[in-house]
Amino acid sequence: MARLTTRRSRIGAALLASAAIACGASACGNGAALSEARTACVKIDHSIKLYKQSLVAPTLAAASALAAHAQSDLLAALGPASRATSSDGSFNALMTSLQESSRVPEQYLVESLQRQCQVVFSSTPYLAS
């Protein structure tokens, strides 16, 4: 009887350890997703700054170069946003907005991307009105 109790204790301890490892791994996944989303938002922020500079550039050539660099930064943000979404579906809106950047002019995406990144960097998943 004592051997059976000891065996059950070992099995219970092993199951508890497995559950703890699984919970820890899933928490790490969400942390990694947040980190990837923040990486994407840093690129997005840089892109928006370049885009706004392109609007007031002194020459057409400078404006075109800045706009192209801004577009390139938006596309570079797609990788981290995709990885964030793969780990945590709550970042899907960010990834989807970035995917639209190849079809929609940046001027129409700026506000949406800024708000989504505001949520990424906040401590709550909601924005105050």
Sequence positions of predicted segments:
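Residue-level signal for mature regions of secreted extracellular proteins and peptides
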Residues: 21, 33-34, 110
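Hydrophobic helical h-region of N-terminal Sec-dependent signal peptides
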Residues: 15-22
